[in-house]
């Protein structure tokens, strides 16, 4: 590598970026500036999302009042930027509105103490009270009721969707939620005209629900990366991802996009939703204006309206790898100046390694690419301190091979098991595996995480070999981040804390390497576990599965060393018990009589 040339390019880029893709002008009134940039509809939607993510228990109508107040104030500032209060920061304006809520202390307890602080501490305080698992009722779509609401007031319907999703997902990527709200309204526009509204609506809502949950999990991981491991972690992730998507783009261009994208995500994670959406729009414009040097796959995206354009760019397929790329070993193992180049600009050199590796390997997971970069960095730290560094680091690529082999072997083992057991059976196998590893974790969390992990089979094992690793590893990163977020709220296991906090990129290998916890003291047998009533018979299949899986976790917490045969016997007895009583004429009487018998047979089987 001509390192002097590279450093010159980097310095040139740094100078250019001081002007930036995003506008850096100062404005007399920030709220007026954002209102003019975003337009009234998007402004109101983003403000509604912001309030819903902070005040997750407030009724919709209360939020609408807050949104209308702030919107009217923004219009006043657009008309006259020197009007009293228009010069205040957005954090100050939002915080003042939150602190005016009469029921703040009664509904949110300690959160009300945030109002005694000054900015920026007040906003940090509000952020710390966001609840990743709020106690809110499940949303159960009733096609006829929803169509009536949609026809009565489309705007309110759109707002209600933003509110319901935002308060359940307090870190949802706000501009992306606007996109999904528009799509949601589009589904109702189509299906409420249909003869069979349910047949049209329900499959579309379910498909969309899966996409929304995945989008929420991706943003939660980004926010956790910044919160727990700093901006550098998110930048590294973005370098790998964008280098895979845009392999023809120069490293300096990728670095520029990464810096801007990190700023956008940092703003949204920090609750600065107006700035985040505005800057995301600017970034989409920049990418489209420069698509010739970024990717040949962008044209279709760039012809779309703003929200669809940004979504499309985020989801765009990977461009073809440029032809005749030199082997990686030339610059990163064979070159005798590797240590000199590394020590002169460590982050830039490692960034270029990650860029070059990622653009050549679209079939690798981002997390695997980051592990490779981390191991490469550790090798250079060790080798560059030796008398003959080149002899030490020249074989580094042989040492990195195991980091690719390990996930490939694990994926094969798990996909083989999935094909043998099916999704539900695979989930149960994971419940057994993870309950034995971390039995201190709450039963609902173990069930939720194991069910999600089990879906990786359906999602990824049917894909071609070239797509299996990114699908599996990156999906597992999202699920394990959910476990880490929930565990942080009520930490109960040192093993989980260690895996969650030591290294972001090594979380999955850390959890995979956990062994059954031999120090765990089993729970006493709880007869209430087998106290059921007739209402179980009318539950949807998914909820019935969750009931059975909850029982399985509790059995393992009582008898962690139960054999596969014992567990199989108990679960078969349990299923037979439910089936028998649900077929009985007097279901409630059957559950009352057969329940105690099941307790006895379970205790006998586990003895």
Curated annotation (Swiss-Prot):
Zn(2+) binds at residues 91, 270, 272. One of its GO terms (biological process) is negative regulation of mitochondrial depolarization. Pfam families: Serum_albumin (PF00273). SMART domains: ALBUMIN. The modification Phosphoserine is found at residues 29, 82, 89, 296, 442, 512. Residues 1-18 form the signal peptide. Keywords: Allergen, Calcium, Cleavage on pair of basic residues, Copper, Disulfide bond, Glycation, Glycoprotein, Lipid-binding, Metal-binding, Methylation, Phosphoprotein, Repeat, Secreted, Signal, Zinc. The modification N6-succinyllysine is found at residues 228, 587. Disulfide bonds join 77-86, 99-115, 114-125, 147-192, 191-200, 223-269, 268-276, 288-302, 301-312, 339-384, 383-392, 415-461, 460-471, 484-500, 499-510, 537-582, 581-590. Gene3D superfamilies: 1.10.246.10. Phosphorylated by FAM20C in the extracellular medium. Residues 19-209, 210-402, 403-600 form the Albumin domain. Ca(2+) 2 binds at residues 37, 278, 282. Plasma. The modification Phosphothreonine is found at residues 107, 443, 445, 569. Glycans are attached at residue 151. GO terms for cellular component: cytoplasm; extracellular region; extracellular space; protein-containing complex. One of its GO terms (molecular function) is pyridoxal phosphate binding. The modification N6-methyllysine is found at residue 557. It is found in: Secreted. Ca(2+) 1 binds at residues 30, 267, 272, 275. Binds water, Ca(2+), Na(+), K(+), fatty acids, hormones, bilirubin and drugs. Its main function is the regulation of the colloidal osmotic pressure of blood. Major zinc transporter in plasma, typically binds about 80% of all plasma zinc. Major calcium and magnesium transporter in plasma, binds approximately 45% of circulating calcium and magnesium in plasma. Potentially has more than two calcium-binding sites and might additionally bind calcium in a non-specific manner. Interacts with FCGRT; this interaction regulates ALB homeostasis. Interacts with TASOR. In plasma, occurs in a covalently-linked complex with chromophore-bound alpha-1-microglobulin; this interaction does not prevent fatty acid binding to ALB. Belongs to the ALB/AFP/VDB family. This is Albumin.
